[in-house]
Amino acid sequence: GLPAVVLLRHQSEAERRRLLRKVLIETGKTATEAAYIWTRSPARLERLVVEIRGQEHLDASLAQGRGLIIASPHLGAWELMGVYWARRLRLHSMYRPPRQQEYEALLTWVRERSGAELLPATPAGIRRMYRALTEGHVAGILPDQEPPEAGVFAPLFGQPAKTMTLLAKLSQRSGAPVIFGFAERLPWARGYRIHFLPAGPEIADPDPERAAAALNRMVEACVQIAPAQYQWTYRRFRRQPDGRNPYHGQPL
């Protein structure tokens, strides 16, 4: 499958198969835990977080007083990240409205019940996000969603990937620092470990392609911590510069 190929292109076929098996198991966990996260109280969900690594990066970024962008890839329990941090920070989360409009009200309720403001990825939503950052608030963004229109190609695990430029623009205009974070799912239902990784200044480089490459390097750094927990079923590489589709003939 493509997940195994991009992660283990220099490893043996047996190692690729082992990873692919783990990916399928973790994908199933992602689907089943989403319903749990959506239906349990935020206070109950908070107790599932048993460890935070990199808290000092979060604290140092907040101490700058210029707002903060938390980039959380589709890795581990990304729904839990929003619930957990909305109770601690003035969080505004960007989202892409679902194709099935009947689900939008449900998703908005689920994600705002902890206190976050959910903003659609529209011009009005982006303006509101920028204002929130200038007021010292926190913006939550999924950095690995393929942009529908704007964006540039940048390498991700050695494969070209259409990558957003929104995060870099928000950081450039507002001066807000950027950190990456995700909730790693621990084995045997032992809870979740949150990781924070600081992004360097290149994440807001004025050159869109350099900024996008820096963004994808940070996504890679997160994924390498828990590679099987990445949402490889999201066809991140389906748009290529030469128009080909690398997923043809792939099981995922």
Locate predicted features.
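A transmembrane-helix-recognition feature enriched in membrane-embedded lipid enzymes
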Residues: G1-V6, L19-A43, Q229-T233
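A short, well-structured juxtamembrane/interface segment
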Residues: P3, W38-L68, G76
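Catalytic core of membrane glycerolipid acyltransferases/transacylases, capturing the structured
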Residues: H10-R18, K22, T30-I37, Q64-P123, ...
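Non-catalytic C-terminal accessory region of glycerolipid acyltransferases
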Residues: H10-S12, R16-L24, D59-Q64, R87-R88, ...
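General small-molecule cofactor/ligand-binding pocket signal
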Residues: E51, L119, L197
